[in-house]
Amino acid sequence: MSFVIATFYHFVELSNYYDMKDEIKAACNNVELKGTILLAEEGVNATISGERNAIDKIFDFLRSDYRLRDLTWKESAAEYQPFSKMKVKLKREIVNLGVSNLDISLRGKYVDPEHWDDFTSQPDVLVIDTRNEYEVKLGKFKNAINPHTQCFREFPQWTESFSESKDLKVAMYCTGGIRCEKSTAYMKSLGFSDVYHLKGGILSYLEKTYNKNGNWKGECFVFDDRIAVDNSLTPSNTIKCIFCSNQVSTDKLKSVPRGQVVCSDCKLQCYSYNK
């Protein structure tokens, strides 16, 4: 059996998000979907998986809410169900930057995946990866700046040491688009005026460009049991240990906490993975 994996987010005011939880959970359970949907006053963020008909039905349901009528999503496929249960969670933020009163309407301009390579090759464009360190170690765009953050909440702290001119163009990217979109709003709140982000993130880039120019190097970490996908969005069987670069079976990583992409030897030697 083949499963459709759909990822989506949408920044929109959901003042009644508390009341939406049970109804959305029931709709997902009725069509046997699994995955996680996050709801907050600022919008929705999710990755869900199920059969083709179930995915179609849930998006018909979600888009029947006028606030979500413009909801779009990205799809990939797997031969197994990458989630064990269906969860709908209430959050303060749909992606946790930890900055209060951020005006998301300040967000930067989209760069379509087909234009990303040409745009980021310009000498006056700085490319910033907004993902976590363990994600960047698996793969990144050439010449992208790595902030070396362990979680998204550390990004504002990193910007305090970011000394580049605010007149430069800044292009930001992440896995599916949500972190880079929110971080562009934050960068603009700091006074950077020419800020851009990759529409749909790395997953959309790989889907639409096939990485034909080789600008993407490595694999892309994903937040489900696939662990990582390659250039063709196919789940990887093995990936590099982020410490020693030896290959690790992704099957061995499905039951460990998020981000622990390490081989057995490094796990024993590294205190942070042996608590």
Swiss-Prot record:
The keyword Methyltransferase does not apply. The active site is at 174 (cysteine persulfide intermediate). It is an enzyme of class 1 (oxidoreductase). GO terms for molecular function: oxidoreductase activity, acting on paired donors, with incorporation or reduction of molecular oxygen. InterPro entries: Rhodanese-like_dom, Rhodanese-like_dom_sf, TrhO, TRHO_N. The keyword Oxidoreductase applies. It comes from the Bacteria. Residues 121-214 form the Rhodanese domain. PROSITE patterns: RHODANESE_3. Pfam families: Rhodanese, UPF0176_N. It catalyses: uridine(34) in tRNA + AH2 + O2 = 5-hydroxyuridine(34) in tRNA + A + H2O. Its EC number is 1.14.-.-. Keywords: Oxidoreductase, tRNA processing. One of its GO terms (biological process) is tRNA modification. Belongs to the TrhO family. Catalyzes oxygen-dependent 5-hydroxyuridine (ho5U) modification at position 34 in tRNAs. This is tRNA uridine(34) hydroxylase. It comes from Wolbachia pipientis wMel. The lineage of its organism: Bacteria, Pseudomonadati, Pseudomonadota, Alphaproteobacteria, Rickettsiales. The gene is trhO.
